Amino acid sequence: MSGARPGTIAITMAGMGSRFTKAGYTCPKYEIEVLGRPLFDWSLCGLNAFRDAGWDFAFATRREETATPFLTQRCATLGITMGPVIELDGVTDGQATTALYLAEQSDQDAPFAVFNIDTFVAPDLLRPEAIDRDLHGWVPCFDAPGDGWSFARTDERGNVVEMREKVRISTHATIGFYWFESARGYRDLYRRHFADGAGVEKGERYIAPMYNSMIAAGGLVRILDVPFAQVGMLGTPEQVAAFAAAPPPGARATLG
């Protein structure tokens, strides 16, 4: 299977975290401790199967946060193979662009995936060997309420035919993990999708809609259904408080 070959997971953690700052937090969001562990650990434990399969983890951070010592220590503790760390001087025009910087530093012919730093997924639900050999894209999704997500619409065969940002075209809301056949493919897709300023939505360059350009070119994209109860959102102070008060079963299981 294509997905079983080790590649690079790009962790985009270069946002401002302004909601946490306004709530009184003084450290970067990913360092905030919940149930005895930093949010960084809670987010990355959902990728244990990729870690065990030998994938590298690359990171995009903000230079002013001097995150490298923290990353080095946490990756060593978690058994993660640490790849490049890119320090950005400011925010980019979207996650797609932040991930592009990491794609440029990755093995161009190996699989490439992007994940955020504010979502918990129960360990072992996301597995590289579950990605079929013929796929060009793979997007884990869950049935989440509301329209504040990216959404994937599938046909009767289960193939993705459309992806939209914060437009509820289906019940398949993405969890924020985006897999691509290769880093080179991600870079080429980025250039095509955002050529001449096209593809920018509300001033931002999102990853999910990039799959529409992949599909239009004949690429095959499928989703993975993830149980809603096994996902915990960590993107806002309110979500973190809810996670601490009632962690998903997969999170409770890791606490022993």
What are these regions, as identified by a protein language model?
Residues 1-12, 19-21, 33, 37-114:
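Conserved N-terminal catalytic core of the sugar/cofactor nucleotidyltransferase
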Residues 2-9, 173-256:
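Conserved alpha/beta core of the MobA/IspD/sugar-nucleotide pyrophosphorylase nucleotidyltransferase superfamily
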Residues 40, 102, 118, 152, ...:
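Residue-level signal for inorganic ion chemistry
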Residues 31, 152-154, 223:
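A structural signal for short hydrophobic beta-strand segments in well-ordered beta-sheet cores
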Residues 121-197:
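Conserved core of the sugar-phosphate nucleotidyltransferase
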Residues 16, 118-119:
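Active-site metal-binding loops of divalent metal-dependent hydrolases
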Residues 65, 119-121:
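A short, conserved beta-strand element in the Rossmann-like catalytic core
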Residues 27-29:
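Short alpha-helical oligomerization interface
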